[in-house]
């Protein structure tokens, strides 16, 4: 019996205004002359080819000829951008072979340990968009069951080697990272100018928010451009000693961004996956000294000292293997840090601290100073134990603010208006007493439901923190939104459950940084 003829008449490219995340999607008509029902099915993988240029995509089939004609193939926005061919170009569409590395994923599902070569092949296919989201999920779930230390090291190395790898002309390149989960907590934007003002190099790449109301990049974008390419980033670092840019535009460890896009909806966040994600980016960034902030609290990502210790050892193990000196500090994760939650409000807090303004959040200032102190003591010229005094000197003197302004000027003007949302209302205490707890997850969700971080001026402005005495009817915080429907949704949710625990017990003091 002869094999079926898989040759097809070419189709012409049509751009579809469809955001499919990071997945390439191709859409063809059920009446397409190129469609063979016995070969093509919805959600199968197809190969689009123009000469030597190839794009793999997940296929979807439509009965709506107004959307896609019989002689067309529609490309989602990510697919159209990556293929980079003009609308109307003739393209062949054929069934795609599964990546050979999927055999290793199947082996992992069955409980086998993977070799470094197998992991490298998987990461290469991930980075080149050869996996569908379902295939990525299969890999993540198989790795979540168990990952050996050898597999972890291979994964970090492979992820760091795909994409941009930065090198610097100084032996000490410092960096900091917080594992997240705490609202506000915008310490990076204070630590970077302090450290750079001292003279240590700190080329900071940061993420945009995924599940939080703001990432460092979302907040910094209100002050300066963050979408710098590699050469622009290097120019800023050489001129200023540091930068605050969006890592997604620099293309560090692109496979990690692809994995994260599937991890988040599945709520997958194992210690090994967290370590691989963070360390692959730091390795690619050329960091030699790394400070990691572990907030510990009942609604933080790390909820106990034992959990923090295990994660710390894993980070240090990977750092030792790749020549990165890793220091882990545990911090108070019981409540938000700073007053503002959401890009505009967080930028306000940062500039208040850098400007030494009356009323600047004391907890944000103190935590930033302590974290900066750890990084400054990587300088061999600085006497041990004097990092905090030096950090305080740089902040109090205005040197850190001056350095921040230099970084802002070098990165270029912000494209975003720094305006608070036009809708605002206070959420009130339901009883007299003392604030005994704040649910960080709840506060994050409320700020996001108000529109943050997409709406830069949306979020929550806190008036009370743990240990504060409140009276019934007194404002706990203010909700801001730029859209009426989002405002109504967030306010109703906050009034139903504020996220504040109020009783008559005095909470225990916890050190900000230990």
Swiss-Prot record:
GO terms (BP aspect): pyrimidine nucleobase metabolic process; pyrimidine nucleoside metabolic process
Gene Ontology MF terms: 1,4-alpha-oligoglucan phosphorylase activity; thymidine phosphorylase activity
InterPro entries: Glycosyl_Trfase_fam3 (IPR000312), Glycosyl_Trfase_fam3_N_dom (IPR017459), Glycosyl_Trfase_fam3_N_dom_sf (IPR036320), Nuc_phospho_transferase (IPR035902), PYNP-like_C_sf (IPR036566), PYNP_C (IPR013102), Pyrmidine_PPase_CS (IPR017872), Thym_Pase_Put (IPR028579)
Entry's EC annotation: 2.4.2.4
Annotated catalysed reactions: thymidine + phosphate = 2-deoxy-alpha-D-ribose 1-phosphate + thymine
Assigned GO CC terms: cytosol
Any matching Pfam family: Glycos_transf_3
Enzyme class: transferase
Claim: Glycosyltransferase is one of the keywords in the record: yes
Record-linked Gene3D superfamilies: 1.20.970.50, Nucleoside phosphorylase/phosphoribosyltransferase catalytic domain, Pyrimidine nucleoside phosphorylase-like, C-terminal domain
Keyword hit for Ribosomal protein: no
Keyword terms, alphabetized: Glycosyltransferase, Transferase
PANTHER family cross-referenced by the UniProt entry: THYMIDINE PHOSPHORYLASE
Family to which the UniProt record says this protein belongs: Belongs to the thymidine/pyrimidine-nucleoside phosphorylase family. Type 2 subfamily.
Protein name: Putative thymidine phosphorylase
Organism listed in the record: Rhodopseudomonas palustris (strain TIE-1)
Lineage, uppermost ranks: Bacteria, Pseudomonadati, Pseudomonadota, Alphaproteobacteria, Hyphomicrobiales
């Amino acid at each position: 019996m002869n094999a079926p003829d898989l040759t097809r008449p070419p189709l012409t490219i049509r751009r579809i205004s469809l955001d499919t995340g990071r997945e390439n999607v191709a859409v063809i008509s059920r009446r397409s002359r190129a469609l063979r029902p016995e070969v093509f099915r919805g959600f199968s993988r197809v190969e689009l080819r123009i000469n030597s240029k190839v794009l793999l995509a997940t296929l979807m089939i439509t009965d709506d000829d107004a959307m896609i004609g019989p002689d067309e193939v529609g490309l989602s926005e990510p697919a159209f951008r990556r293929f980079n061919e003009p609308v109307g170009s003739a393209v062949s569409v054929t069934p795609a072979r599964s990546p050979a590395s999927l055999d290793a994923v199947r082996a992992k599902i069955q409980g086998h340990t993977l070799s470094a070569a197998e992991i490298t092949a998987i990461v290469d296919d991930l980075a080149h968009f050869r996996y569908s989201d379902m295939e990525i999920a299969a890999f993540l779930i198989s790795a979540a069951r168990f990952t050996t230390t050898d597999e972890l090291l291979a994964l970090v190395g492979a992820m760091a080697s795909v994409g941009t790898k930065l090198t610097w002309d100084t032996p000490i390149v410092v960096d900091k990272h917080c594992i997240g989960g705490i609202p506000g907590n915008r310490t990076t934007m204070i630590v970077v100018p302090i450290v750079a003002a001292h003279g240590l190099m700190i080329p900071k790449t940061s993420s945009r928010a995924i599940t939080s109301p703001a990432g460092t990049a979302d907040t910094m974008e209100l002050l300066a451009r963050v979408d710098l390419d590699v050469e622009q980033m290097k120019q800023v670092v050489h001129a200023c000693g540091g930068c605050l840019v969006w890592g997604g535009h620099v293309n560090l460890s692109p496979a990690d961004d692809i994995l994260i896009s599937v991890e988040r909806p599945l709520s997958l966040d194992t210690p090994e996956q967290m370590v691989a994600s963070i360390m692959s980016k730091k390795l690619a960034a050329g960091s030699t000294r790394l400070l990691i902030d572990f907030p510990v609290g009942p609604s933080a990502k790390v909820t106990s000292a034992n959990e923090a210790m295990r994660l710390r050892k894993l980070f240090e193990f990977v750092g030792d293997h790749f020549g990165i000196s890793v220091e882990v500090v545990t911090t108070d994760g019981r409540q938000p840090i700073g007053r503002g939650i959401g890009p505009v409000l967080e930028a306000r807090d940062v500039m208040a601290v850098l400007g030494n303004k009356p009323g600047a959040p004391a907890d944000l200032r103190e935590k930033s100073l302590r974290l900066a102190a750890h990084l400054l003591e990587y300088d061999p010229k600085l006497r041990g134990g004097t990092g905090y005094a030096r950090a305080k000197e740089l902040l109090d003197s205005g040197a850190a603010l001056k350095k921040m302004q230099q970084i802002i000027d070098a990165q270029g003007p912000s494209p975003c208006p720094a305006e608070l949302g036009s809708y605002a209302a206070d959420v009130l205490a339901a009883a007299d007493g003392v604030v005994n707890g704040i649910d960080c997850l709840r506060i994050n969700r409320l700020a996001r439901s108000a529109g943050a971080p997409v709406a830069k001026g949306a979020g929550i402005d806190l008036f009370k923190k743990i240990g504060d005495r409140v009276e019934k009817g007194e404002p706990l915080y203010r909700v801001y939104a730029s859209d009426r429907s989002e405002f109504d949704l967030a306010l109703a949710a906050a009034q139903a459950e504020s996220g504040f625990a109020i009783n008559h017990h005095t909470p225990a003091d916890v050190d900000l940084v230990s």
